[in-house]
Amino acid sequence: MPRSLKKGPFVDEHLLNKVDAQNEKGTKQVIKTWSRRSTILPDFIGHTFAVHDGRKHVPVFVDDSMVGHKLGEFAPTKTFKGHIKDDKKGRR
């Protein structure tokens, strides 16, 4: 079930403060965050976030198509190494 419209999107306040400070200064430094749950707002467009995936920080550059999604959607936590090939000829 989606979030209620009267509540608005969730964004960690410390993350919003960092973006606002960079917008005031006019700088575009990488913002390191562990907040995968924060919703991407239009203010975030053009910024780069280093989103933690449980092991390292993955750089995520925000563009206009990402608005409304969560930061964690763009930093996958699991690496898919492929299915094991079923080699029936080698068993004989």
From Swiss-Prot:
Keyword RNA-binding: yes
Molecular function in Gene Ontology: rRNA binding; structural constituent of ribosome
InterPro entries, per the entry: Ribosomal_uS19, Ribosomal_uS19_bac-type, Ribosomal_uS19_CS, Ribosomal_uS19_SF
Keyword Acyltransferase included in the entry's annotation: no
One annotated Gene Ontology cellular component of this protein: cytoplasm
GO biological process: ribosomal small subunit assembly; translation
Keywords tagged on the record: Ribonucleoprotein, Ribosomal protein, RNA-binding, rRNA-binding
A matching Pfam family: Ribosomal_S19
Family: Belongs to the universal ribosomal protein uS19 family.
Functional note: Protein S19 forms a complex with S13 that binds strongly to the 16S ribosomal RNA.
Protein name as annotated: Small ribosomal subunit protein uS19
Upper taxonomic lineage: Bacteria, Bacillati, Actinomycetota, Actinomycetes, Mycobacteriales
